[in-house]
Amino acid sequence: MESVVLLLAFISLVCGYVIDPCTPQERSTWHVSIKLCIRVQEYKISSRGCRLTQGPGGLIATGNGFKIFAYDECGHDEHSFLLTNIRESVYASGHGMYAEISNNVTYLDLVSPCARNITIIVSCDDITINAYGKNIDELHPDVTITTLIDTSCVRGHSFAYSINTLCTERLSGESCEQLACQAIKGSQHENYLKACELNAPEQYMFKEYKPHQRPHVAKVLRDEL
C-alpha cells in the first residue's frame, strides 16, 4: 500500500514539482482495527447488547453471550491503553457474534513497546472451564496481538487485523481487512454493529467474574480498584 504513495511522489518529481498527497496528521495517525467472528453450536447467544468498561490498561466488553478482555503489558501509569472503541452484533439466530475493536492512534510507531503488546481474550459467560486456544501475530510497526479464545464453548472463530496510517488507507481506498462472519460480508457489518454502552468501573465488579477471569480484570484496571 505504501508503494502507492511512493509512486505518486516519483511522478510529481519527474514533472518538476512536489505534491504531497497526504497531510502530516494523516501520515502520523494509525488506524488500528481488530475484527473477531465467534461461532457456537450448543447454545444460542442472546442479543442483549454489550457494556464497555474501560481501564488504564485495557477494556472489558460484556453481554451478547461473551466477555471480551483486551489489555496491554504496561505497568501502573506507564501508558494508557491504545484501543477505546468496541462494537458488536449477533448473527445466525444466536449462533454467531461479530466484534470490532479499534481506535486511531497518533505516532503508534513511537509509543512504548509495552503498549504495542496487546492481548485479546474471548471468554464465555456461562462456562467456567478455563480452556483457551492461543494465537500470536507480529504486525507492523512492532505490534504484537495475542488472541485467546475459550474453546470450552466456542466451536469456531476467525479474526482479521489492520494497522495502517490514515494516509495509506485513503490512498488505497481500504479502511481495514474485511472479515466475513455468518454470511455477512465486508461493509454489510455496518448495518448491524452497535457500540457497547459505557460503564464506569466499580468496586463490586470483581464479583461479577469467575475466578479464572479476575486476573484479566486486574490487568485491565491495573489494580486501581
Swiss-Prot record:
Record's protein name: T4 protein
Disulphides: none
Species, as recorded: Rabbit fibroma virus (strain Kasza) (RFV)
InterPro entries: Apoptosis_reg_M-T4 (IPR016399), M-T4_sf (IPR038687), Poxvirus_T4p_C (IPR007579), Poxvirus_T4p_N (IPR007580)
Recorded family membership: Belongs to the poxviruses B9 family.
Highest taxon above the source species: Viruses
